[in-house]
Amino acid sequence: PNSSGYNRINDYSIVIKYVYKNNSFLFTGDAEEYSDMEILESGKNVKADLLKVGHHGSCTSSSERFINAVSPKYAVISVGWYSFYGQPDRCVLDRLYNIGAKLYRTDKLGTIIVKSNGEDIQFNKEALDYPETKIPYTSVRLKYRALHGGKNIES
């Protein structure tokens, strides 16, 4: 975090970029869009081969601008099976699809192990096909509204 006064507790999440030889990994924890934008505005190089997608792939994180700046070849979403909150959100999945990132999700694949020798990145599982990972956007919107007092996602 760059500030000491965030409105959302998740924006206090630690964001770490790890570089090993020619491979780079960006771990965003539960950071949400406010933190993402703060990082981009700081001018730090966020480009990474692998992105651990923020806040379980929620629409409140991983903005299009942030994902485009990171431009990952691989994206890992850590999320529970049949998440009550409807995560990951379709908008985040679409953003990752649009940049061509290979997708790995813990709810679909279980434990994901990533290995790097500094040149190549290897996974213990095969990447998912995007059509199989999509969930109806309306169901996400309904869950969000139910959890946030009737407010729309865009609010």
Question: In which residue ranges do the predicted regions lie?
Answer:
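Cap/insert and terminal regions of metallo-dependent hydrolase folds
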Residues: 38-111
